[in-house]
């Protein structure tokens, strides 16, 4: 429900500025959380039966065709970021750390997604729905990629196979 009526220019400016602030604010808060606080066995992160050991992501979403094109924001964070584009190692410790980082990244994108309904407060209804669509289009592929990678890494660790 629209509570604030602004001229179109200011509404668009507010939309762009607020999305930037939300993205950066959530990311900067999330990188402050120690990695040990994330548990891949937690209800949010653990593999669900419907994911079919990650096969759902390839069978339905064809993740292998587009995952490599996703942006990696880690380089923007300097030492606080964990680069996910190029695998830096294949040993067990690195894969476990990478799994924890997939939890952080997934939660980051879920939190960003939760902000989308706020845009109904100053946008028309159709633009509010457009903001929800934008948030879903921006964040859901990144969430899917984190879940897919975590399932894959868990399988590699379980099988004792360091091959990607």
PLM feature spans:
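Hydrophobic, lipid-facing residues on alpha-helical transmembrane segments of integral membrane proteins
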Residues: 13, 17, 21, 25, ...
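Transmembrane alpha-helical segments and their cytosolic interface motifs
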Residues: 94-127
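Juxtamembrane membrane-interface segments at transmembrane alpha-helix termini
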Residues: 140-152
């Amino acid at each position: 429900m629209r509570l604030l009526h602004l001229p179109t220019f200011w509404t668009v400016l507010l939309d762009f500025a607020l999305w930037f602030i939300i993205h950066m604010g959530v990311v900067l808060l999330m990188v402050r959380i120690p990695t040990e606080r994330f548990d891949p066995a937690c209800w949010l992160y653990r593999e669900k039966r419907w994911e079919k050991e990650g096969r759902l992501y390839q069978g339905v979403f064809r993740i292998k065709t587009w995952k490599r094109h996703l942006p990696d924001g880690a380089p923007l964070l300097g030492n606080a970021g964990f680069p996910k584009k190029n695998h830096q190692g294949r040993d067990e410790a690195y894969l476990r750390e990478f799994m924890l980082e997939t939890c952080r990244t997934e939660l980051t994108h879920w939190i960003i997604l939760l902000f989308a309904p706020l845009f109904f407060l100053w946008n028309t209804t159709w633009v509010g729905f457009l903001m929800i669509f934008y948030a879903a289009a921006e964040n859901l592929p990144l969430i899917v990629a984190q879940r897919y990678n975590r399932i894959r890494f868990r399988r590699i660790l379980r099988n004792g196979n360091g091959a990607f």
